Regions:
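Short beta-strand/loop element within the Bergerat-fold HATPase_c
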Residues: 60-72
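Short alpha-helical Gxxx[C/S/T] motif in the catalytic ATP-binding
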Residues: 109, 113
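Short conserved segment of the HATPase_c
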Residues: 84-96
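A conserved beta-strand-to-alpha-helix junction within the catalytic ATP-binding
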Residues: 2-17
Length: 142
């Protein structure tokens, strides 16, 4: 993937505006985070995780997005008030797996997010508690 420097905070803000989700998303992000990664792949990755967070959290809850920069990588957390069962958790990145069979979708979003993260040289993980779920991506910026 060809890298091009862009502002990650701006990219995520744009995704939130496109979904008309400003009232449901709270961003805790530095204003200017320029990263040298593939723009289209990063945009698709963040779109999948934002959409997933909005889709699987209670209707009037707030999705939180936090960007944490360091010298070698950038970490982005997508935090929502939905939960994932302990039985479901190990399978969320499997193709065609859907934890909630009544929700729309084909079970391809999170597996694609995992592939995009790996293509960008990063890591993705998920953790859940009884009150929230956090998807974390860590991407290299060197």
């Amino acid at each position: 993937l060809e890298d091009k420097s862009f502002n990650l905070t701006e990219l995520i803000s744009e995704l939130v505006r496109e979904r008309k989700a400003e009232a449901r998303v709270k961003m805790n992000c530095p204003e200017h985070i320029n990263i040298p990664l593939h723009h289209t792949a990063t945009r698709e990755l963040c779109a999948i995780l934002l959409d997933n967070s909005l889709k699987h959290s209670p209707k009037n809850s707030v999705v939180k997005i936090r960007i944490i920069p360091s010298k070698q990588n950038i970490t982005v957390n997508f935090i929502n008030d939905g939960t994932i069962s302990q039985q479901t958790l190990p399978h969320v990145f499997e193709r065609f797996f859907r934890g909630n069979q009544s929700a729309k979708g084909y079970g391809l979003g999170l597996p694609l997010a995992e592939q995009l993260t790996k293509a960008l040289g990063g890591q993705i993980s998920v953790s859940t508690s009884k009150n929230s779920t956090i998807f974390t991506i860590s991407l290299p910026i060197l």
